[in-house]
C-alpha cells in the first residue's frame, strides 16, 4: 500500500515538460572539463620520480632536533640544513654490515646507526627491515631514552665536503669536528683507521691522540695529501731534519764560544740517498711554521754564510793509533807483573831458607820414633815421672805441628795476596795510561778543530 501511495505522489514523466535549451546547458555543466596537455604536479611526480630508498628513522629524535634548531640562530640552522643535504647525496655509497648476533638493532650496526634499512648486507637474523618495523622502533626508543644524542653523527660535516687529494692544502677549509675525538697512539693520525683523518678533518681539542701530525700546517699531512708531487721534497726535508739533530748532538766537541757561532753561521750538508748533496739555511721549525727547503749543491743561500761541515776528529784518530795503544797497555802490564814478582822473591828469600832448615831439624829431633829408639838403647825401666815428661813432650810436638800448618796456610794467603796486588797494580797502571792517552787525543782533536775553523772562516 505504501509503494502504491508513493507511486501516486511522484509525478509522471509525461506530466513534466523541460525546454530543450535548458536540458543542453544542464548536460554541458555535468560534463568534466577538457584535459589539459600539461600534467598536474602530483601526477608528474608519481610518474617521473623513481622508487625512493626506504625511509630513515621515524622517531621523536627529529622533534628534539627541530626544537634545538629553533632555539639557535637562523644562520646556524641554515648551515645545518645545507650540511645534511650535502651529506645525504645519492652518490654516497652505503656500507654493508656483517652482524651475526645483534639482529642489526645495535649502534655498532652501521646500517642501523645511519638510519637506513639493511639492503644487500651479510647479516644474520636481521630485524632492520620494513617487515620488522615494530621491533625496530622499540629498539630505537630504548636507545634514545638512554642517550638522546645516540644517532647523531660522530663528525659534524664540513660545508666544503671532501676535496680532491691533489688540491692545494692551503685552500681546503676543514671546518668539521669530531664529537668524541680520536685516540690514536702510533699512527700519528695519518692512517685511515683514524676517524678524523678518514673524515678529512683536523684533530681538535676533543682528541686524545699522541704524537699527532693531523694539524694545520703539518708537513707530513701535506706530503700525504699532495701525493707524489711533494714526496721528493718531503724526503729531503726529513733527511735534513735528521742530519740537523745529529749535528746538534755532536756540538759538545766545540768550546762554548764556537757553539753559538756555529748555530748561527755554519750550515750543514748531507749526501741523501739519491746521491745529491743538500745544504740547509735554518733549523726546521715546528708547529706548522714554514720550513726552508734545502737547496742543491753549488747554490748559495741568501742571507747566510754556508760552509761544508767537517768534523774535528777527521785525520786525528787513525787505525795505527789503536794498535799503538794496545801494544802500550800490554807491555806496561807485563812490566808491572815482573817488577812486583821480583820484589816478592827478594823479600822472601833469606828467612824462608833458614826457617826451612830449622823446621827439618826440629821435626827429626822431636819425632816420637827417635825417643823410642833412645829408650830401647838404654833398656832401663821407665819411671812414672819420665812417662809424664814424655807425654808433655808429645803435646809440645803436636802444638809445633799445628803451628807449622798455620804457617803454611799463612804463606799460601800471602801468595794469593801478592797475586791480587799484582792484578790491582796492573789495572791501576793500565787505567792511568788510557786516561793520559784520551787526554792527549782530545787535545789533538781540539787543535784540529781550531785549524779547520780558521781555514773555513779566515776572517
From Swiss-Prot:
Residue ranges with Basic and acidic residues bias: 79-89, 340-349, 395-413
Residue spans of biased composition, Polar residues class: 1-16, 38-49, 60-75
Residue numbers spanned by region Disordered: 1-96, 340-362, 395-420
Cellular compartments annotated: Nucleus
GO cellular component term, pick one: nucleus
InterPro entries recorded: CRC (IPR005172), Lin-54_fam (IPR028307), Tesmin/TSO1-like_CXC (IPR033467)
Keywords recorded for this protein, A-Z: Developmental protein, Metal-binding, Nucleus, Zinc
UniProt main location, coarse: nucleus
A Gene Ontology molecular function term of the record: DNA-binding transcription factor activity
Domain CRC: 93-217
Role, per record: Plays a role in development of both male and female reproductive tissues.
Domain notes: The cysteine-rich domain CRC binds zinc in vitro.
Family as reported in the entry's similarity comment: Belongs to the lin-54 family.
Protein name in the entry: Protein tesmin/TSO1-like CXC 7
Native species: Arabidopsis thaliana
Source organism phylogeny: Eukaryota, Viridiplantae, Streptophyta, Embryophyta, Tracheophyta
